[in-house]
Amino acid sequence: YGSTRKHVLGLRVVLMDGSVLEVKRGDKVDFDDSEIPLSNTTKNTAGYLLRPGMDWIDLFAGSEGTLGIVVDAQLRLLPKPADVLAGVVFFTNNEPALDAVDAWRNIPGLRMIEFFDAKSLALLRERHPEIPFQAGAALLIEQENGDIDFWADHAPEDSWFAASDQDRERFRRFRHALPEQVNDTVRRRGFLKLNTDLAVPIARGREMLLYYQVRLLEQAIDNYVIFGHIGDAHLHVNILANSDAEFKSGQKLLLEFAKHAVELGGTVSAEHGLGKRKAHLLELQYTPSQIESMKAVKRRLDPWWLLNQGNMFPLSPC
């Protein structure tokens, strides 16, 4: 469906001086700014979207609450699909799963391709022992007006498929059980969660996944899972540190991953924003002059730097 930004038709925003700005799609910003190049990815939430003559909506969307407080939003809704087919397709390892992603990516109506690596499935088996024992990777798919006969011909026999709302929701719960278990594990072990939100150009997705796996192995980090939005070359690496040494190694490795993603033309934040803990990554993706252009917009709308201090930019005097 594309980014959230393009589905926003209007906003009411309270600015830091107490004024209220009401804008609709097509209302242009009242200042000129240089264009900041975007990463060559389907998603990017790192920094502000800036380009000459841009809409106010495009500036506020994804700004992490650093420019104003959105109190009302008008959204464009799409018709609910009459029929959605869902499935969990299991593979023996990553390679056939990645081949399937390449083969299926442009299937009409395919709206979701989610990836689980072997370690993700091992963690999920604690709650879902029905996962085939030989499965070393999996894809969760959803297709509008799907053809079950097609999937019967192209998916391994032990895959799961459902067309009912109830079963489809069960598959969604299966997907969301993984980050829940990751968070539970992290809490029990007493370390902060170490995770990525990186995306790379689709053509580099396989390369990036292999890079993750090789570097984790070389650094002797065994407690991790890799899962997420493989259709967008946007996978999450979660390191579940079990010692101080593993935590410190994981921190260094996540920074290395971010640098490599940018080298491949990717982004340091695909969907979740930088917040405070990842604000330091902004300088990996943008030049000092580009970041200064973003800060100039921040100073214009929040001259005292009071909104969401430390989000996106490390704490800075006005």
Spans of model-derived segments:
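FAD-binding subdomain of flavoenzyme oxidoreductases
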Residues: 1-107
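Short, ordered loop/turn segments at secondary-structure junctions
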Residues: 26, 118, 273-274
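Short conserved micro-motifs on helix faces and helix-strand junctions that flank
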Residues: 59-62, 198, 228, 269-270, ...
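C-terminal substrate-recognition/cap domain of FAD-linked oxidoreductases
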Residues: 61-63, 69-256, 260, 264
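Short, highly charged C-terminal tails/helix-capping segments
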Residues: 170, 274-279
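Conserved PLP-binding active-site segment of the aspartate aminotransferase-like
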Residues: 238-245, 277, 281-285
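Short acidic/histidine-rich active-site segments
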Residues: 267-274, 309-312
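Activity-critical C-terminal alpha-helical subdomain
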Residues: 279-318
